[in-house]
């Protein structure tokens, strides 16, 4: 079974070969999948080759051949899209956000509508799935500038950060983070997780908010910050 990024890359290569007869360059693939580095493309190509979907032709630059496509092509996978986290797991921050009551969407003058991008699953990171589920109204003072989205919490991996099952976290899109921030982090261009951001020398540590989950250490090229926690909404 292919991950979404593997699936998207395979379809992008296939479409380019059908259109021009020439495989895309690594720069083109990186840009199409909105990856931070070519190393992510190398890993995806290696995974596709190991699974028998493509092969690299020897002694030829940019030589890729698509051997087969998945038996079932899911709708919406034909064109790569920018990453939008929708299934991620909880993390821990320096301080817990104070929960806010859910806003009344009927009062358009008192709320700002932002997209809910999916659910936060407790446990280890899960493959990032890109889709918008619905919208939610939040208090205007929770939106301090920039683009925002919401994620629904499911599970216990954020309990010591004061974030519980059923809560909705508000995320501000950013690629920067300070130590101790709760961030949405993209790991290896494929998996998303909500964790406490730390630096350990040249490495990055992603800490859980539950002692049952170990801190995970990654090289800096393996982690890409996608957003920072700025608020929380709780329904009663």
UniProtKB/Swiss-Prot annotation:
Keywords: Autocatalytic cleavage, DNA damage, DNA repair, DNA replication, DNA-binding, Hydrolase, Repressor, SOS response, Transcription, Transcription regulation. Gene3D superfamilies: Umud Fragment, subunit A, Winged helix-like DNA-binding domain superfamily/Winged helix DNA-binding domain. InterPro entries: LexA, LexA-like, LexA/Signal_pep-like_sf, LexA_DNA-bd_dom, LexA_repressor, Peptidase_S24_LexA, Peptidase_S24_S26A/B/C, WH-like_DNA-bd_sf. The active site is at 157 (for autocatalytic cleavage activity), 195 (for autocatalytic cleavage activity). It comes from Chelativorans sp. (strain BNC1). Represses a number of genes involved in the response to DNA damage (SOS response), including recA and lexA. In the presence of single-stranded DNA, RecA interacts with LexA causing an autocatalytic cleavage which disrupts the DNA-binding part of LexA, leading to derepression of the SOS regulon and eventually DNA repair. Residues 84-107 are annotated as: Disordered. It is an enzyme of class 3 (hydrolase). Residues 26-46 bind DNA. It catalyses: Hydrolysis of Ala-|-Gly bond in repressor LexA. Homodimer. The record marks 122-123 as: Cleavage. Transmembrane segments: none annotated. It comes from the Bacteria. Disulfide bonds: none annotated. It holds the Pfam family Peptidase_S24. This is LexA repressor. Coiled coil: none annotated. Belongs to the peptidase S24 family. One of its GO terms (biological process) is proteolysis.
């Amino acid at each position: 079974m292919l991950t979404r990024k593997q699936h998207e890359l395979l379809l992008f290569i296939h479409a380019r070969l059908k259109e021009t007869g020439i495989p895309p360059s690594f720069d083109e693939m990186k840009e199409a999948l909105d990856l931070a580095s070519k190393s992510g493309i190398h890993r995806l190509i290696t995974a596709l080759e190991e699974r028998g979907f493509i092969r690299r032709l020897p002694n030829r630059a940019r030589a890729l051949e698509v051997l087969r496509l998945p038996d079932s092509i899911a709708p919406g996978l034909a064109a790569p899209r920018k990453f939008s986290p929708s299934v991620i797991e909880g993390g821990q921050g320096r301080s817990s956000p104070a929960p806010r009551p859910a806003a009344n969407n009927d009062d358009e003058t008192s709320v700002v509508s932002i997209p809910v991008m999916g659910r936060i699953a407790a446990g280890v990171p899960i493959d990032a799935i890109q889709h918008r589920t619905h919208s939610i109204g939040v208090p205007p003072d929770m939106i301090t500038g920039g683009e925002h989205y919401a994620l629904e919490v499911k599970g216990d991996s954020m309990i010591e950060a004061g974030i519980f099952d059923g809560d909705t976290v508000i995320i501000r899109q950013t690629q920067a983070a300070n130590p101790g921030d709760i961030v949405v982090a993209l790991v290896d261009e494929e998996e998303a997780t909500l964790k406490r951001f730390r630096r350990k020398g040249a490495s990055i540590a992603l800490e859980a908010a539950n002692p049952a989950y170990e801190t995970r250490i990654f090289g800096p090229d393996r982690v890409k910050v996608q957003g920072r926690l700025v608020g929380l909404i709780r329904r009663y």
